[in-house]
Amino acid sequence: MDALIKPLRAGKPDAKPADPKGTEFRPAELDPAEFLAAAVKPDQPRPSRGEAEQAVKTLLAYIGEDTAREGLLDTPRRVVEAYDELFQGYHQCPAEVLNRTFGETAGYDDFVLIRDMSFTSHCEHHVMPFYGKAHIAYTPVERVVGLSKLARLVDIFAHRLQTQEHLTAQIAAAVDEVLKPRGVAVMIEAEHTCMSVRGIAKQGAVTFTSRFTGMFRDNPAEQARFMSMIRGGR
């Protein structure tokens, strides 16, 4: 099931219809600036670390905690340090990860698939973790990218506040834009703690999203082969 990505900004028109020649790969509603560059600019105004720690202290007081007790004295600092790690993707550039490619393909003309890349991200609605596996396939034209680069790409986008649909679309769009392959297939399966530990509390529920471009979008047989290779051997 191809994830239906709605316009991500208010007032933006719906995505353009697919080009019949299969040349319009990138979802029209995604601005390249949001998936090719670091999300935070070096000169972008930001709260100070002290202000961030004070915000954590305020939240602790809001839930009724005594922020002066021994066990919580260093909690604001620890939380801010954890945020630096969990959301480091805002300071990383996805395009740079994919820019180094190799031309020694010996005429290889089938798709390349990396499956079961584990990741943890945080939903933008409740800032709670969701985690699972990402599967990426692409069919190179002349050059291929190092296998670890696709895993790093997943990590960059996962280390930002996300929805699973947006994460899926960003990964596919970045691979399409930088590598210019014949097609890209991305599938993500994840469990969301905002659904499993709060609200309806349905533990074990898994959400699937996918995005197909180019030869994958236009050829259901290639989609089926991609899916069967993901499931093979499990």
Swiss-Prot record:
Organism: Rhodopseudomonas palustris (strain BisB18)
NCBIfam families found in the cross-reference section: folE (TIGR00063), PRK09347.1-2 (NF006825), PRK09347.1-3 (NF006826)
Pfam families (alphabetical): GTP_cyclohydroI
Superkingdom field: Bacteria
An annotated GO BP: one-carbon metabolic process
Enzyme class, spelled out: hydrolase
Annotated EC: 3.5.4.16
Reaction catalysed by this enzyme: GTP + H2O = 7,8-dihydroneopterin 3'-triphosphate + formate + H(+)
Keyword Protein biosynthesis tagged: no
Designated name of the protein: GTP cyclohydrolase 1
Annotated segments matching region Disordered: 1-26
Biased composition (Basic and acidic residues): 11-26
A molecular function (GO) term: GTP binding
